Amino acid sequence: VDKDTVNHWLPLLGCHCQEVMNYFFRNLHLEECQLDELWTFIYKKEKQLTALEKLAEVYGDAWVWIAFSPVCKLVPAWVVGKRTLSHARRLVFRLKSASDGQIPFFTSDELPHYADALLEVYGEQVQPLRNGTRGRFPKPYRVPPPDLCYAVVVKKREQGRVVEVSTRLVYGTTQQVEAALQASPVSHAINTYGVERNNLTIRQHSRRMSRKVNAFSKD
């Protein structure tokens, strides 16, 4: 099959798959959700881009943001883009749109974008009172709702190898985390194992996502 033919049909197939996903992935009941991102590149790596190619924001480093449900082995939301807060926010917003409104127990790595995105999408706005009767009201801010529970897995690396793994609670209470883990049929501790295993499956089955191989697909 000619490469131009493949390039013609792939966008059409992708749009159709997205429509099918949007149709079926509604009102999903998610008890637990793991967030992560996969690195790859388009055409060439970021450090090899020219100034003009960087302005286009099409080539170079690309990240596949994934929200993964370890209970039902489902990816209810994903985003392709740069490693920015706006793309993290888009991922969480798509996840919320696909769910039934219940906030799942979130876990991820220590990337700070997730905490900010969760607060922006699920947070409740608070309007502070002003002092006195004159002047503008203070700028409103967002606070995490009582049922938002989010913990991160922190990996310490030395010379590229993981030497220590710890966890940290960002939103919620220790009691909420313990209750979520007791209710989970798959997780017995704060982890991102499910989404990391899913990432490995993606890399093994797609040459576009393969790393450190002599058959990387970039054309």
Features from the language model and the residues they span:
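Residue-level recognition of single "structural anchor" positions
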Residues: 1-219
